[in-house]
Regions:
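Bacterial Sec-dependent N-terminal signal peptides
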Residues: 1-24
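Processing junctions and N-termini across compartments
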Residues: 13, 30-33, 100-101
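Short glycine-/aliphatic-rich beta-strand segments at the starts of folded cytosolic domains
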Residues: 22-34
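Short, thiol/selenol-centered motifs that function as redox-active sites or metal-ligating centers
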Residues: 33-47, 105-109
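N-terminal, post-signal-peptide region of Sec/Tat-exported proteins
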Residues: 40-82
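Short secondary-structure boundary/hinge segments and terminal tails
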Residues: 65-66, 96, 100-102
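Conserved short beta-strand edge segments in small beta-sheet-based binding/regulatory domains
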Residues: 87-99
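Short, low-order "capping/linker" segments at domain edges
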Residues: 100-122
Length: 123
């Protein structure tokens, strides 16, 4: 009976350890605020500068940033902070005022006028 309990305990422990294993090529997506191709370049560069980010592509229309990440080397929170530090908001991390204020005039995505101007350009 003790052997059965021991075997079950070992199996449960191995299952819980494997469930916590971080992936080498995890696919991650998040929304990032921005309005133009300059924003795209800045957002992708900020993400790629994080250790462990292998691929970054931001869609101007949908604001979706798709990433391939080595979860053993970085976290989503670290990537979001890097993007915020260059002036772009994510759902969980807002850009500091000084970072947002340093953006080029056409990249001020919080300004409704700028958003409307970019919508007209896309049509």
């Amino acid at each position: 009976m003790k052997k059965i309990v021991l075997v079950i305990t070992i199996l449960l422990m191995s299952v819980s350890v494997s469930a916590q294993k971080k992936k080498k090529n995890a696919k991650v997506s998040m929304d990032v605020d921005g309005v133009c191709m300059m924003c795209k370049s800045r957002i992708e560069k900020a993400a790629l500068n994080c250790k462990g980010v292998k691929y970054a592509q931001w869609n101007v229309k949908t604001h979706e940033l798709k990433l391939i990440v080595d979860e053993r080397k970085t976290t989503v929170k670290t990537i979001q902070q890097s993007i915020a530090n260059v002036g772009h908001d994510t759902k969980d991390v807002k850009a500091p005022k000084e970072a947002y204020d340093s953006l080029h005039g056409c990249c001020k995505y919080r300004d409704l006028e700028i958003q409307e101007d970019h919508k007209k350009e896309k049509q």
